[in-house]
Amino acid sequence: MELKTCCIILPLLCTLTSYAEALDHAAILKSPNELQLECSKYLPSIDVSQNVDCYDRCIGLVGRFWNDSIGRPAQTIARYYQPDTGSQDHITRTDQCLCEKVLTVPRNAYCQRASSGLQCYLDNYGQLLTGTPQFVPVTEIRAAQIFWDCAQMLQISRDRLTQIFKDGYNKTSEGRCLIRCFLVRAGLYSDRQGPNIGRFAVQCEGYTAEYEQAVVSCYDRLKKESLDSCSLATRTMDECIQGNQFSSSDIDGLEKLEVQ
């Protein structure tokens, strides 16, 4: 199987700005109720001019499980549901519904496709966990903020930060510690427990049992090498996450740094 490209987005340094985060790191967790409340503040329930309800599309965008270019809910939407215990065909039923009620809708009818997609999950996948916060994937903008935040904490100048990414972040101890800081601050990794597989699965859309086992086996192998904390974190990202052949990610891959 072809190796998937990296799902952690490294920022364009020319767009980095300083950013103040809460003390509990920068991970964002939101429940369906919170997604709905947030969208209710952004837009009315009905676009009067076009008579189209874009509320569900907004929920998908804020929860990072909807992308107009794909036109159907990402696999990550499943984290908001408890599958039906009495049936094992909830995935099949949901996929069938998506084929019949989403893929038949014109590609540019984004709001209609989003609403139909969410309805398929509500009707077929299981119980919506309305009050349970779930991890929201890191976007490119947030990644840039977190990296610059880490650079400030590690006393890495902007010029040096640019050089680290230009030369390769895994080439120096500074670069490796920068990656460790990013992973910890993004809520994807800890020195005590290693990679948070559930959150990485959301970030990289790797949901199979093979994906999880590959991460566990890879991390266990690296721990036996008695690496320092920064090297362990960086190699975990490089070898266990971004080199994971079982990731089904349709998220933008790791982007090579372009310094202007």
UniProtKB/Swiss-Prot annotation:
> Any one Gene Ontology biological process term?
sensory perception of smell
Signal sequence annotation: 1-22
**Tree of life domain:** Eukaryota
- What UniProt keywords apply to this chain's record, in alphabetical order? Disulfide bond, Olfaction, Secreted, Sensory transduction, Signal, Transport
Q: Which GO terms describe its cellular component?
A: extracellular space
Q: Which cysteines are joined by disulfide bonds?
A: 177-230
Q: What induces it?
A: By blood feed. Accumulates highly at 48 hours post blood meal.
Q: In which tissues is it expressed?
A: Expressed in the ovary at 48 and 72 hours post blood meal (PBM) but not at 12 hours PBM (at protein level). Expressed only in females with high levels in ovaries and lower levels in the fat body. Not detected in the midgut. Not detected in the head at 48 hours PBM.
What CDD domains does this protein map onto? PBP_GOBP (cd23992)
Q: What is its main location?
A: secreted
Looking up Gene3D superfamilies in the UniProt record yields: Pheromone/general odorant binding protein domain
Q: For this protein, what is any one GO molecular function term?
A: odorant binding
Q: Where in the cell is it found?
A: Secreted
Functionally, this protein is described as follows: Present in the aqueous fluid surrounding olfactory sensory dendrites and thought to aid in the capture and transport of hydrophobic odorants into and through this fluid.
Q: Which family does it belong to?
A: Belongs to the PBP/GOBP family.
The cross-references to PANTHER family, in alphabetical order and at most eight, read: GENERAL ODORANT-BINDING PROTEIN 99A-RELATED, ODORANT BINDING PROTEIN-RELATED
Name it. General odorant-binding protein 45
Gene name of the record: Obp45
